[in-house]
Amino acid sequence: MKQPSFSTPHCQNVKPAAGFTLIELLVVIAIIAILAALLLPALAGVKNRAQMAADINNCKQIMLSTILYGNNNEEHFPQNGWDMNVKNWGADALSTATPPGLMQLGPATGGTKADYDRLYLPIQVPAFRKGLFGSYLQNPLVLRCPSDVENVNLYRRQQYLSSYIMNGAVTKFVKGVTARFSDPDVRGNNIVMWENDETRVPTPANGNAYQGQWNDFSNFPDEGISTRHGDGAMIATADGAAFRMDMRDFYKLAGTYPSGFPGGGSAPGNGVGTSKNNTSNGNTATAPNELWWYQ
């Protein structure tokens, strides 16, 4: 009887599968790196567009609250926060102390996120709810630009609650008065609010300059606009519209200075709180316009 053979002559001729060579591996890694370099900016752009969409929605909601407030208050705009002893759109009142019912401002020298979340946000949110918009704007998170929460300068502000500020024009750039929607100088395309310039915050390095930039809920137009979204920022107008405005267009209306930086409405040489039509410091704005509502 012939015994079965267990030899595998054919298998002896099979060569093991070859692995990747070093060069092939490096080529694959290079291709992955190129694809990542191409995709990451696109993904960042998608994220930024999503944040801007939420940003515009925030502005619309705040502006709707402004219009509703006007409808219920003889067409007046709300107090903007320059008079710290009365209710305004962002709070019941403002204070650097800790009396009950007032919005306590954070320190000009800054702090950490934990400090602000623990010490100031628990006070500033209830103060907002007691302010003029408390019954119109139920969710205080609407006051924050989605990309602002990633900004370290957020924790060097006194007014920690809102990324947006109102135009000082709503009180005619002075304390104690408020404009009306029905005023002849108020037009539908007048800019009522915008994203504040997050780069201008008080720090020990600059001698706590710009302390007035974030100590309330309103600014002069030439105190600056946000750079979070590149060369434009969100604004809202008196007719309720909200959109992204090119920074160059904003500063054509607001007025710029030789340094290229916004000067601030209360800068030296600008008279009583306005830089409109003032060229002594190089301001190029001509009032009235969409930002400087009044001559």
Segment roles from a protein language model:
Residues 1-20:
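N-terminal leader/signal peptides at the extreme start of proteins
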Residues 7-10, 23, 29, 63:
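Generic alpha-helix initiation/capping and coil-helix boundary signal
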